[in-house]
Amino acid sequence: MPFFSSCLCPSHYSGPSLPSSTSSSLPTGPENQLGFVLLQAMVHHANSSCVRNAFWLQITEKLTPALSIIISVVYLRCPEMVENRIGFLLNVKDSKTLSVVGPHPKPCIL
């Protein structure tokens, strides 16, 4: 996943900050591992110091046919913009693609 390799920063990665209600609704099983990894990467992307501005981001990635979930991750906070809270809607369409859409038409500035 070349996109995430440029955004993930292991030096300050602290893991995903998912609401308990969201994390408990995640599907289980090895066939859903890719989806969960992508979700972790997106949550980190929103929480990490890589983010310099509010952003609009759409990513499409092939997933296993068994993965069919809609997860709403809201109020993720950027460390450098304490008052700016960002929400995501993660929507798995046709169990094959994952679309991540942010609320703002500005790109992620690395």
From Swiss-Prot:
Expressed predominantly in brain and weakly in heart and lung. Expression is reduced or undetectable in cultured glioma cells, primary glioblastoma cells and malignant glioblastoma tumors. May serve as a molecular marker for or play a role in the malignant progression of glioblastomas. This is Putative protein RIG.
